[in-house]
């Protein structure tokens, strides 16, 4: 049997991690949660991650820095950004670097579902 794709969730807010994890699992994907970008980068799940949902504003390494670190490591993981501070210049920077989504918190679960379906569903 094929293993479900892994969606990693990086957010410093416990409630966001719990909500996103529940949503991801309801779609049949495996969810791995991390409270920081640094924890994700050190995780054994890094190379198995099929899609990443990440906050922009976090203590320590922020979401854009995480995106840059992944690119520097040649990791081509599709990233969906969620943020409580949706600045246009940040969105443009994230998308220019390859983000597949950029959404404001509180995020509508349907937009995350649509984005995950686009990235992870075959055909």
Segment roles from a protein language model:
Residues 35-36, 62-65:
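Acidic catalytic/metal-coordinating carboxylates
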Residues 65, 86-101:
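Alpha4 helix (beta4-alpha4-beta5 surface) of REC/receiver domains from two-component response regulators
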Residues 52-55, 83:
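Active-site residues of response regulator receiver
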Residues 89, 107-117:
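C-terminal output helix
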Residues 76-86:
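A short, hydrophobic beta-strand element within the central beta-sheet of small alpha/beta folds
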Residues 14-32:
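Two-component/phosphorelay signaling modules centered on CheY-like receiver
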Residues 58:
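Receiver (REC) domain active-site loop signature in two-component systems and cognate sites
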């Amino acid at each position: 049997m094929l293993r479900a794709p892994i969606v990693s969730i990086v957010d410093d807010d416990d409630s966001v991690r719990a909500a996103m994890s529940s949503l991801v699992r309801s779609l049949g994907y495996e969810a791995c949660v991390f409270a920081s970008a640094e924890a994700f980068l050190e995780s054994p799940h890094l190379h198995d991650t099929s899609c990443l949902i990440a906050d922009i504003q976090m203590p320590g390494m922020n979401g854009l820095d995480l995106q840059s670190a992944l690119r520097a490591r040649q990791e081509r993981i599709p990233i969906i950004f969620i943020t409580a501070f949706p600045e246009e210049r940040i969105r443009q920077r994230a998308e220019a670097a390859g983000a597949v989504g950029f959404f404001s918190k509180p995020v509508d679960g349907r937009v995350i579902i649509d984005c995950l379906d686009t990235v992870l569903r075959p055909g």
